[in-house]
């Protein structure tokens, strides 16, 4: 039986989560249909655009994403403190980007002085609900999946499920796990042979970051790295230059069929993480196989299980072997 979401997500322990949504029956609903010949590749752009829009409205940052032909990967960061700093008006305006609000909210947003004291109390009550939702991964994924499903069904002139009923989520508990899952996501299209380089890996965060880098711009919709010039938000705990070198070395090693990466120069990120080249290669190639639940060092996994009241501690042996 699937675990309830409160046993999978706990922002008091970690703000980072890896989420996966798969198309029903693992059908390829975002590429060329082999039976009809119809190309649905444009749906990947729908998903990417929706992710960007959601990241603008939610107190949730996009660390990494990859839109595949029959599933999506996203690595998310919950910026809980950011949501708490929004005014009531900001919360209502952000929620209205996606849903039609009650008449009292619509009237208030059209004329901020046209409400009674009772209506103002109702607005404050609604803003509390909306604020909580705007920092919820469940609502983030719901607004992503529901929108894409409706649009795809309209295009196909049919009804029914587009996605599997529940998305999978993994708590990412430390820097080793975070760097590993981001690399796993960014390299996924190349390993699936739907791209050949990081630059032509379409509808991925790494391509978006590289395009921004070439234009000397900051990726607008993504969580910045620590070496970014954009300092208005909490950055990822490592530099993009080090991360890019590491995943490039990883990719080159795989192409040469090496058992571990052999960079020309020592990689600062790998040294900072304290991981061996062999363990890095293994974890970033088999992340979902090695870890089916929360990911991190054994101590962090034990703490997460205790805080979330989970009796089972899956994959502790793998964490001990590869991430300790």
Model-inferred region functions:
Residues 1-324:
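Short catalytic/metal-binding and nucleic-acid-binding patches
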């Amino acid at each position: 039986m699937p675990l309830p979401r409160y046993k999978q997500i706990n922002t008091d322990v970690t703000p980072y989560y890896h989420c996966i949504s798969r198309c029903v029956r693992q059908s390829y609903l975002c590429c060329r249909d082999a039976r009809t010949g119809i190309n649905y590749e444009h749906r990947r752009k729908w998903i990417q655009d929706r992710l960007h829009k959601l990241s603008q409205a939610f107190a949730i940052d996009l660390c990494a994403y990859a839109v595949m032909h029959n599933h999506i990967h996203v690595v998310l960061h919950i910026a809980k403190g950011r949501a708490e700093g929004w005014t009531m008006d900001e919360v209502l305006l952000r929620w209205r980007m996606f849903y039609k609000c009650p008449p009292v909210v619509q009237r208030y947003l059209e004329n901020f002085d046209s409400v009674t004291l009772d209506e103002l109390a109702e607005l404050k009550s609604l803003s509390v609900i909306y604020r909580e939702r705007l920092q919820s991964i469940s609502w983030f994924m719901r607004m992503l999946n529901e929108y894409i499903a409706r649009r795809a069904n309209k295009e196909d002139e049919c009804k029914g499920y587009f996605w599997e009923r529940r998305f999978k989520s993994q708590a990412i508990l430390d820097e080793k796990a975070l760097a590993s899952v981001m690399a796993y996501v960014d390299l996924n299209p190349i390993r699936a042979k739907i791209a050949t380089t990081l630059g032509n890996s379409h509808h991925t965060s790494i391509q978006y970051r590289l395009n921004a880098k070439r234009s000397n711009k900051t990726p607008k919709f993504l969580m910045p790295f620590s070496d970014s010039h954009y300092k208005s938000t909490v950055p990822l705990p490592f530099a993009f230059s080090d991360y890019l070198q590491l995943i490039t070395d990883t990719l080159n090693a795989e192409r040469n069929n090496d058992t571990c990466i052999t960079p020309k120069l020592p990689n600062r990120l790998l040294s900072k993480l304290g991981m061996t080249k062999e363990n890095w290669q293994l974890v970033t190639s088999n992340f979902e196989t090695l870890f089916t639940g929360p990911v991190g060092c054994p101590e962090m996994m034990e703490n997460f299980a205790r805080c979330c009241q989970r009796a089972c501690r899956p994959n502790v042996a793998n964490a001990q072997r590869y991430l300790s």
